[in-house]
Amino acid sequence: MEKQKPFTLFVPPRLSSSQVSAVKPQTAGGDSNYFKTVNKCTEGDFGVPLTMSSLSKNRENIDTDPAFQKLSILPMLEQVANSGSCHYQEGVNDSDFENSEPMSRLYSKLYKEAEKIKKWKVSIESELKQKENKLQENRKIIEAQRKAIQELQFENEKVSLKLEEEIQENKDLIKENNATRHWCNLLKETCARSAEKTSKYEYEREETRQVYVDLNNNIEKMILAFEELRVQAENARLEMHFKLKEDHEKIQHLEEEYQKEVNNKENQVSLLLIQSTEKENKMKDLTFLLEESRDKANQLEEKTKLQDENLKELNEKKDHLTSELEDIKMSMQRSMSTQKTLEEDLQIATKTIYQLTEEKEAQMEELNKAKTTHSLVVTELKATTCTLEELLRTEQQRLENNEDQLKLITMELQKKSSELEEMTKFKNNKEVELEELKTILAEDQKLLDEKKQVEKLAEELQGKEQELTFLLQTREKEIHDLEVQVTVTKTSEEHYLKQVEEMKTELEKEKLKNIELTANSDMLLLENKKLVQEASDMVLELKKHQEDIINCKKQEERMLKQIETLEEKEMNLRDELESVRKEFIQQGDEVKCKLDKSEENARSIEYEVLKKEKQMKILENKCNNLKKQIENKSKNIEELHQENKALKKKSSAENKQLNAYEIKVNKLELELASTKQKFEEMINNYQKEIEIKKISEEKLLGEVEKAKATVDEAVKLQKEIDLRCQHKIAEMVALMEKHKHQYDKIVEERDSELGLYKNREQEQSSAKVALETELSNIRNELVSLKKQLEVEKEEKEKLKMEQENTAILTDKKDKKIQASLLESPEATSWKFDSKTTPSQNISRLSSSMDSGKSKDNRDSLRASAKSILSTTVTKEYTVKTPTKKSIYQRENKYLPTGGSNKKRKTVFEFDVNSDSSETTDLLSLVSEEDISNRIYNNNTPDSHLLVKTPKQTPLSLSTPASFTKFGSLKKMREDRWATIAKIDRKRRLKEAEKLFT
């Protein structure tokens, strides 16, 4: 794109109604300087809120303007008319009557133009008042928005206080839940009797599975929707890119067309200049012909004098001959006698006479013809001299008018230079005020900044459009004035044509600017549409998140209902416990161990449930924040829509005005053609009048020489005025370039804001991805918890079966087996698990024997030992604690599988028959190789019996190592997602830069 040429803005001043009497047509220099001063007024006022002081200053400048103080030009015109009439007072009175008619027309036109100027002044004052009202309304709106922002901040503080209170309430609820869980642990003592209710848990498990399947399906749908949105965004970006290219090509095409038009206009101007030079050459030729015709006329007069003398001589000869003829006749009468002798002489004489008479008649005819030709030549010469005299008179009048106008222009230039200095000072003050306002506006919040920037754009567009309308009006007036002046002065035609071309080029530039402004408004509309689409997408995503949250809440409500039912069951079971306590006193020590382990399981499950509840609350808070942000954005988008609609309406109205102005320009061109025709008719009339004005030829020749001297002086003055005008134009161009730099800065700020918006959108997308990863982790944890529940249920069923088997075995066994058990207690080595050592089992049995148990307990132990000895090797029984193999497998879910047994790993080994609940008896860390050697005695595990004690519940422990590894995995995933989000941001920023470059 080539840089646009600097141009000057012409804006008409505001008139006071009391000063207008008539409008005087001015020269090009005066008009241009006048409108430049007014242009500075408008540039100083642009972009700053108008006040009454500025209006008063403008009005004082208008009142002191010399252009309007000297509008009453009627006496001047009368003087010109009187001076013109004194040159041809000796002529006919009809010419005075014909000159009075165009003067009356001129007066009527001048009064019409004065009325138009009054109307224009009233409309400008009303527009200024409207602008002041709009500025006051905008200030009120800004203050209201500030108050609303303060209220929102107070509300946010209140909400934060409420959140803290709710957090404290949640802590209290957690304490209450811990207390209730202690009661729930008592229920686990009677889990054997509550086996019938496991079917309900299985049914609920299936429901939860279905819920999780639905959640997975929803997540997959979300992923597909996000991919579709990404594809749509890329398609929209490509469409925008293509549209921008098309608009760029159109603009280039329009520039080429306008350049062609400019070249055509320049060619026309050159042709007009050539025509004017040709006319001047014709004038010179005519003057030369006049002088030649005068010389010829003098020569012809001398010839006519000579011919008159010849005619007189011939007439005398003729008279002499006639007298001789009479004498001869008398002599013939006297001398009849001598007739015969003289007949021959007479015949000869008659012949000679006839010949002489014929020759004389031919000479007379030739003389008559020469007289007629000379008379025609004389009449033609008289006509040409008359036309030339009239032309000289008109030129003298024009020269006098030009001298008067030059004097007026010099006075106006001096006054306007002083006004220009005042306007520059005023403009500087306004620029300082603008900077102060900008610093104040920068302190507002980001949302207000965005809104104000859009409003500034709208105001700038309005201001530019108003300037364009003012410029169009002023240029139409200038074109009209120039057209009138073309009819008055042929010598200034070149200057006026140049000004007309400059005005047309400036109009074309302003049209291009209008097109660019419309393109910018279209771009803003497209960006607003994109924002609306993104907001709608965000709303849909929020709805989906809300549905997920509602489902989670429903699940929580179900769990709470289950807890309530369990509490009711607790109350019922307490009554039963009092009756059953007597029976279970013997088995109390064993049950305590089971209860401790089950409590630990329950606590771990509760801890995980609390974590999930906290995560759900965090997600709810995030969703609420997103909702608020989307509501704010939707409000901003609606406001932008309304502003864009208003801008569209204004642009359409201004386009209509431009079309109307173009129609007016066409009409003015037609009027120019008609005025040219009238001018030609006037020339013909003047040529007729020249025939009457032969007397003033000699006077005009002297006056022409004086006029030439005055013309030379006027040309010098015009050159000086042009130089001054060029200096002032350069100053105006510098001011316009300053404004252009300011506009470029504003555009850069808009681009940076667009980048910030895009960064925000990318951050939101990365936050969404992080939330999805957290959801997937929570689901995995829930799946692991479900598996633990299933394992516990299976172990409960096994305990039931073992209880039934023990009851049957006690009835069948004899007292002999009991005696054998008493004799050899140490010989029987029980193996409670495939991974418990014999030494441990012996120590546990000895401790149980020495602890002062009741006889029933001993009998049951002996019976169980007898049954083990009598039964085959294939019988298996459940143990109180979970096997080391199962614990090892659970840990291996979170750890990578090793290839060899030589790697040393720590495994938990449980004390089965511990009577006390001390920490030393519960856990002991043992290496994997030592355990395998102790359990199998360096043999295969197939050679050993798998013995399980009755009424044992499994314990699901999650080691601290597994928790730390799970946390490290989470961090790794978050880091990966962060790097992916950064890469996406960089890629989108590059694409945005490509779009805007």
Curated annotation (Swiss-Prot):
This is Synaptonemal complex protein 1. The lineage of its organism: Eukaryota, Metazoa, Chordata, Craniata, Vertebrata. Transmembrane segments: none annotated. Residues 828-863 are annotated as: Disordered. It comes from Rattus norvegicus. Residues 835-851 have a biased composition (Polar residues). A motif (Nuclear localization signal) lies at residues 118-121, 701-704, 902-905. Major component of the transverse filaments of synaptonemal complexes, formed between homologous chromosomes during meiotic prophase. Required for normal assembly of the central element of the synaptonemal complexes. Required for normal centromere pairing during meiosis. Required for normal meiotic chromosome synapsis during oocyte and spermatocyte development and for normal male and female fertility. Residues 207-363 are annotated as: Interaction with SYCE3. One of its GO terms (biological process) is cell division.
